[in-house]
Amino acid sequence: MQKARIKLASTNVRSLEEVANQIKQIAERTGVRMSGPIPLPTKRIRIVTRKSPDGEGSATFDRWELRIHKRLIDIEADERAMRQIMRIRVPEDVTIEIELIS
């Protein structure tokens, strides 16, 4: 049977876990096999900028960081389960990718 690989990514951990739990509940209700959510390494994007706009004065820096959290879910591509997954309300800050694999 075909599998669906669902990749979730977000800067907000709570909304990411919420979507992953909804997918998990759908899998339990429909009785399909599921593995995950597997936490993937968090990508940390760091940007360091000078506080002073003109370059004069003491060298003080602002440090900014953006963390991108990811989860991976493999689920059997059952038609009923996939229809319910497609109808999940996904918050704006969560990116979702669904890929069918054999």
Swiss-Prot record:
Coiled coil: none annotated. Involved in the binding of tRNA to the ribosomes. GO terms for molecular function: structural constituent of ribosome; tRNA binding. It comes from the Archaea. The lineage of its organism: Archaea, Methanobacteriati, Methanobacteriota, Thermococci, Thermococcales. GO terms for biological process: translation. Keywords: Ribonucleoprotein, Ribosomal protein. This is Small ribosomal subunit protein uS10. GO terms for cellular component: small ribosomal subunit. Part of the 30S ribosomal subunit. Belongs to the universal ribosomal protein uS10 family.
